[in-house]
């Protein structure tokens, strides 16, 4: 009897908390190359929020005009969009104009973080370690420039579009003859192609929850992919990649990674939540920041829920915690929503 009563009280409490958020739009799908991943993330978030009594509704900006959010009287948005028009500051700017608070980073932080080259420039300016790179911009480079990249970065090296996620368009180039094809593949997706020094060693990722001084790093996950190839397919559609949490790094290294990630998160002025990817040189054990994802995946294979679970945070609680951070840029700067 008491067990049923406890369950009833827990459900009632969850429903009560959910009601405080008002009508919530879970933005999913969108128009980027990561649309399918976004739909998977969004469906998971939608189900989790509803299970906690939140009046949550799916909203696909590729199928509906964003202005309908205001007309339909949504109180806030959980952004489960990935890639362009979703985590690049575009939808964030639209929500700012509509006066609807949203999850994740604001306009400027989102637009900087999705641009891997801009992120690198900011990191280097702040003295944060990131792999050496060469930028190739469509229309301003020739075959000689492409051939010269291995001379500057060594082999192997990484070639990827500057503004895509989920490893879409990424190629690990192991010999000079593969450069032209790798650049052509990346250029199909972006006018800016990032060629990056390859760091051989442990690949790790670390989520962050919170804003400013209240931001905290979650447990680090070490990623062990088949043949070291953590590509789009291995990220989302296979079970052969290992995700180790606890990460099993040498003593003290996890804390160093967490501190570095928090520093990068605050440097870009991220808020709410994000996830940073890091490589650790196998010889020197020096960590190198690769990128920060300001709208991380929330699929069954995604890393933020996995790390949160290791910290004792369920998927449902994680969604609620992220939803609690909804804000507008001008609110966080001391203003109020119109």
From Swiss-Prot:
Protein name per the record: D-alanine--D-alanine ligase
PROSITE patterns attached to this UniProt entry: ATP_GRASP (PS50975), DALA_DALA_LIGASE_1 (PS00843), DALA_DALA_LIGASE_2 (PS00844)
Protein residues bound to Mg(2+) 1: 277, 291
Cofactor entry: Mg(2+); Mn(2+)
Pathway named in the protein's UniProt entry: Cell wall biogenesis; peptidoglycan biosynthesis
Record's cofactor remark: Binds 2 magnesium or manganese ions per subunit.
Keywords from the UniProt entry: ATP-binding, Cell shape, Cell wall biogenesis/degradation, Cytoplasm, Ligase, Magnesium, Manganese, Metal-binding, Nucleotide-binding, Peptidoglycan synthesis
Top EC class of this enzyme: ligase
Binding site for ATP: 150-205
